[in-house]
Amino acid sequence: PVKSAKPENQKAIRVEWLDGVFVEFDKLATLGDKSRIHLKIVNTNADDCEVDLYSGNLTVINEKGEESPIVSVKLGSKFNDRRVTALIVPDLPTEMVIEVSKLQSVALLQLKDFKNNIVKLRGLK
């Protein structure tokens, strides 16, 4: 029998955002008074895809149902507190890190690009 690389209980949260472009939850890390949501953007298309994000269009709801303000966003090598853009190359996962004030878990993470494409990930720990 073929064994999965990940244990059964470590099922990755992966959601399609754009046509053929997925958002994968990696981990939630806390350092001091900040938490970082680590994600991967994966393009399964044959062509490159540009992702353009404004921090005001990102929503993070904590375990208490409160919206956590976005401190900064990193997408690939771009890092900013307002807007990031990156070219997502096929089959090469691009790291995305969203920094927010400290939280225990993410009840809801909503990403919306400038074309109003929305993706929601829930229950991130």
Where are these regions (language model features)?
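Short amphipathic beta-strand and strand-loop transition segments with alternating hydrophobic
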Residues: 22-30
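Hydrophobic residues positioned within well-ordered beta-strands of beta-sheet architectures
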Residues: 23, 37, 94-96
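A generic structural signal for beta-strand entry/edge sites
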Residues: 32-36, 106
